[in-house]
Amino acid sequence: MAISPRDEQNRSVDLWFAYKVPKLTKDADSDSASGYEYVYYDRQVGAVQKSPNLMNDPKGALFYTLDSVFGDPGDTTGWILYNDEMPADANRSNNATLGHTKGVIAFDIASSSALWLLHSWPKYASPSVPGVPTPLYGQTFLCLSLDLATAGKLAAQMALHQQPQVYLPRTGGLDHTSPLYALTQPLNASAPGDSDSLDFKTRGGVPFKVIAKNRKWGKDFWNDLVGPTLKADMYVETWIRGKIPPVLDSDGVHKTYDIKFIDLRKLGAPWAWPETQDHAKWGITTTDNWVCVGDINRMVTQEKRGGGTIAFQDPKLWKALCETDLIIPPPGKTDAQARAMIRKTHEPAE
């Protein structure tokens, strides 16, 4: 069977993006939320929209996509699941030396098709245990269609750089020389500490770039790699629970600022929350329409973990994440005051 992302109506689609809302209590800035509501985007829809579905319902893009893979797999269908916090049915302990990475690569050898779901949700996904994990925090999801050869190239990059913690793989008859098969085997702990940028296209021809680093690289991923690779300043939303790298990167040119408040109300979704309730890992450049969806945080401790992000130029999604005030001031503050607050988080007083 052909493998591809599925949209909100269970139709094959080239790519989609979703942003899950955290569990929220109603206040002056936001409606309450169960933690399973989300906004959704694909290029056919053409705009970021509030989904009528919930992520813990048996419908919607995330459910339909994984159900099409796990529900009734053929003999030549397989998958590679990876997460730095594995679900309980993986039945083994997490290895903190492996990558801070989360996702699913699914493939079908007979149809030479594949998909890649990169997300930020711990303990997800499981092929045998239905349901979804904690609703507490905001999470991001990006799902792309691939051909089998491209999936193999991405797997080869992962083995050297992101070094994901793989669990419950199904090889689907892969040749043992395949990079996909190699990713299901123990990884090379002596791989050199470096970074990488790999260009690829979806089956629909949309160009993407995977930017990744090995745990031995020893620098801040967002500040010293993503910004310089894209040649732009960035605003980044990640999980921050520790010391943060400086704004200015090592080349002394590009800056990375941390988002402090997220508001979906201008997208027609009645929710807003501070970054302390968000576990997503995404960023946007200040110019050139670059959107990044990844799985590694902007903290000093993450310099010792492998990880990556998928970067792509999408003016509509970029505009939704930027110009519609997802990066907005807390209540009572202007945009200028909000950006000053973000800068003050990192830059010492003069």
From Swiss-Prot:
GO MF annotation list: deoxyribonuclease II activity
Top-rank taxon: Bacteria
EC id: 3.1.-.-
Alphabetically ordered keywords of this record: Endonuclease, Hydrolase, Nuclease
Enzyme class: hydrolase
CDD domains, sorted: PLDc_DNaseII_1, PLDc_DNaseII_2
One Pfam family it belongs to: DNase_II
Other known facts: Unlike their eukaryotic orthologs the putative Burkholderia deoxyribonuclease-2 are probably not secreted from the cell, as they do not have a signal sequence.
PANTHER family: DEOXYRIBONUCLEASE II
Protein family (similarity comment): Belongs to the DNase II family.
Name of the protein in its database record: Putative deoxyribonuclease-2
Organism in which the protein naturally occurs: Burkholderia thailandensis (strain ATCC 700388 / DSM 13276 / CCUG 48851 / CIP 106301 / E264)
